[in-house]
Amino acid sequence: ELIFRLVYDQAGCRKPIKRLWISSMEESAIREGFENLQPGSDYDNLYHSALCRQRADWLVGLNGTRLFTVLYGGKVLKVGRVQTPTLAMLVEREEKIRNFRKEPYYTAHILAGGMDAATEKIAEKVQAESIAAASEGKTATVVSVTKEKKTVQPPKLYDLTTLQRDANRIFGFTAKQTLEYTQSLYEKKLVTYPRTDSQYLSDDMEDTARNVIGAVYKAILFEEPSGAEPDVRRVMDSKKVTDHHAIIPTMEIAKADLATVPEGEMRILSLAANRLLCATGEKHEYETVRAELDCGGAVFSVSGKSVIRNGWKDFEAALKRSYKTTEDKEKEDRKLPELSEGMVFEGVRTNVTEHFTQPPKHFTEDSLLSAMERAGAEDMGDDVERKGLGTPATRADVIEKLVKDGFVKREKKQMLPTEDGVKLITVLPDVVKSPQLTADWENALTLVAKGEYPMQAFMDGITDLVNGLVQTYHSISDEQKSMFGGGAQEVFGKCPKCGGDVVKGKFGAYCKNKC
């Protein structure tokens, strides 16, 4: 919307405009769009929101980057409305990991009836060994058995962020790669519009969804249909569809030669197709069993799980069998023998195991995207439409900029802040690195797009922030400047023109007075 409006305004055009709004490049979708052109004025608020975002990014980035680069000298310190809070989250996680001190704990175990039952965590090894010794060779009695049936509902359809997360977790793709692959598929008419933040289809798409599911079975067959009718109504809710509906394959997959689709794109297409089957599949049902056994005066517990109906997870498993994935393998479910209160097990064996508390995990691109999406959510009500840092369309570029600028590095699947990244967050004020503040801005931009918040009020807040930064941070010590290679410079002599000090810069010697 913004790109066209900028050209329209700069050209001085005053002709009336109509808006073509489509979510697919299929001929039928384009034809329908042209038959239902919308008045351009219907999208004025969307334009105002995009213009606010552009100007806010420019004001914060331009002034913040120049301010802190000049203050600290040396390396260019890029400050961004979204990228700085994102870097701050990475640095905060790294600090927690570095400061973590692992602590040991112990559990005593009994081996009975093919089961390994354990105590709760025990701080002292001596106590765990004492419990194990008191139970060795004794009789264990089942004192309680708790069974509970549980359900896992099918997942929602993909928006761009959840697609990027799964592609990173399953295939190791970066967020940028996933967006590029999906954009290419969109241009080939094989998937719908990628830059969406909706995980639902509109209510009028029931027939479309059923037809696409049929095409998926024929073109990208993961498993033979189970016989269960797809529940397409579950993925439909016009109230939860924003500018564009969720990402799904199009009917073009039934006509296209999928053998010619590049491997990376085919994997993304398979993800989108598989998610449509999962989202409209049956619920996954299982039963958990927890038993407590008394032995030697101590209580030991053991848990198990058995699947009642695999449901939509059959499709998920089929996808993973189709591709070699980088996803961490899930622990296999442990099924317990049939147990009842009062059952006894004679002559149990015992042992003690040592464990350590675990630090927080490093961010992966999957978990970082999730953190960006959820930033500030805990302080916002459930009725808030947009939460987080950036938009689905911009998050990939934000991550890539941090890597390119040398503030973040990739190590295998982990996203780690560099030394310069840690230093930058250390010196920047909270007001520019707060994920909560940026999430509040994103919420305000959403309200601008809906016509519920004045454009000027948003820009006044951004301008006040930038003015406050420039007025507050105007000088630092040479010691602080040295953090990024700035600070005191060696004097080579006097300037013959003004008598000022001549120092060596990046591109040669120059007068500090810049005469």
Regions found by a protein language model. Give the residues of each.
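Short loop/turn hinge sites at secondary-structure boundaries
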Residues: 137, 447-455
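Short, amphipathic alpha-helical interaction segments positioned at domain boundaries
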Residues: 209-223, 421-450
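Functional cation/ligand-contacting sites centered on basic and imidazole/sulfhydryl donors
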Residues: 72, 464-515
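Short, flexible/disordered secondary-structure transition segments
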Residues: 283-284, 379, 455-456, 473-480
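Intrinsically disordered, low-complexity terminal tails
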Residues: 170, 456-460
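Short amphipathic C-terminal alpha-helix that caps PH/PH-like domains
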Residues: 135, 272-273, 462-469
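Toprim catalytic domain recognition across nucleic-acid enzymes
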Residues: 1-373, 381-387, 393-407, 412-414, ...
